[in-house]
Curated annotation (Swiss-Prot):
Transmembrane feature ranges: none
Protein name as catalogued: Flagellar P-ring protein
Signal peptide annotation: 1-25
GO CC term, one of those recorded: outer membrane-bounded periplasmic space
């Protein structure tokens, strides 16, 4: 059995754990949003013309021909019903956009255009006048313009089954003109609700306390997600108050410990709050021992008793002098060291996910494990 296999069987990872959570400051503007002040999604159906033979095939996308006939009819062009319009330079698309809060008629917004037929490319196409509607089926903007398609590195990945850039979708910068404004109740009510981006009772209470320090008896934490502000129904007063409140610094403990794993690629993201407890987790032919380092020399004896790669005649002093522990063990308190050690051993992504799940189940991984 090779040294690598022996090393895989017993991976000894020492973790020096610490439980002090550093505080850091965030502004209220970065932690909350104002209820009712948000973007509104818009959607529309339109046609792109001017394609270089890369549009929809009429036999497989009949709705494109039907839409083209309807458009020409509205422009006064009569097309016989039995005419087969086999055009290859037209494509049916879905147009989407976001209408920002407090937008006014006449402003421009960006739009995203996506093919809904079998067009091979939208490069060089022009979007014809397309009404964009909201959830209430009212028209809020009109889109039209030349579409910009990114073809940079447009090759299929050999490792993962996806394209780095798609040519059947694109953007139109300032491609839509706002025609209708959305009403909002800002400045018309005596209360304003701040919505926390991440629900947390402690954060809600701290935000309320800091606001009341500057504006006494103004803020009330309703729940872990909402802090209510009591004010007067006046635009000037609310704008002035919010501008000051949003700049208040809030001292918060470290963020929620979380480990996010991409099941397809094996990518792992670990935030700085992840801490490990002492335990032993086994998966297949691998065993991971997570242990607190208290005495380096004593723990080297412990390491030597478990790891078959260490020569029997190798002295503890020699191991310490050669900094042996830095090669196969760590004394950090985060999960990054375990993942790095396993990656060096050639652990596959599915094996790594199994190990993390076992560590979570055993209570060794004190963090939220999210697999996407």
């Amino acid at each position: 059995m090779s040294k690598k296999i022996l090393f895989l069987i017993k991976v000894i990872v020492f973790i020096f754990t610490t439980f002090s959570l550093p505080l850091y400051a965030e502004k209220i503007r970065d932690l909350t949003s104002i209820q009712g002040i948000r973007d509104n999604p818009l959607i529309g159906y339109g046609l792109i013309v001017g394609l270089d033979g890369t549009g929809d095939q009429s036999t497989q996308a009949p709705f494109t021909n039907q839409s083209l006939k309807n458009m020409l009819s509205q422009l006064g062009v009569s097309i016989p019903s039995n005419t087969n319009m086999n055009t290859k330079n037209v494509a049916a698309v879905i147009v989407t956009a976001n209408l920002p809060p407090f937008s006014h008629a006449g402003e421009k917004i960006d739009v995203v255009v996506s093919s809904m037929g079998n067009a091979r490319s939208l490069k060089g196409g022009t979007l014809l006048m397309t009404p964009l509607k909201g959830a209430n089926n009212q028209i809020y903007a009109i889109a039209q313009g030349n579409i910009l398609v990114s073809e940079k590195n447009n090759k299929k990945s050999k490792i993962h089954n996806f394209y780095s850039n798609q040519v059947n979708s694109g953007k139109i910068h300032h491609g839509a003109t706002i025609e209708r404004e959305i009403d909002n109740n800002f400045g018309k009510q005596k209360t304003i609700n701040l919505q926390l981006n991440q629900e947390n009772f402690s954060t809600a209470q701290r935000i309320s306390d800091m606001i009341n320090t500057k504006y006494p008896d103004t803020a009330t934490p309703i729940n872990s997600k909402t802090v209510q502000l009591n004010t007067s129904a006046n635009n000037d007063v609310q704008v002035h108050m919010l501008s000051n409140i949003q700049d208040i610094d809030i001292s918060l403990p470290s963020q929620e410990a979380k480990v996010v794993v991409n099941s397809r690629t094996g990518s792992i993201v670990i935030n700085q709050s992840v801490r490990l407890g002492s335990c032993v987790v086994s998966n297949g032919n691998m065993s991971i021992i997570v242990h607190q380092i208290k005495n380096k020399k004593r723990d080297l004896y412990f390491l030597k008793s478990f790891n078959k790669n260490i020569k029997k005649d190798q002295s503890i002093e020699d191991m310490a002098d050669k900094n042996y522990m830095n090669d196969i063990a760590t004394n950090k308190e985060n999960l990054h060291n375990i993942v790095r050690a396993l990656n060096k051993l050639g652990t596959k992504p599915d094996e790594l996910m199994s190990i993390l799940q076992l560590m979570k189940s055993a209570g060794c991984l004190n963090a939220k494990l999210e697999i996407v």
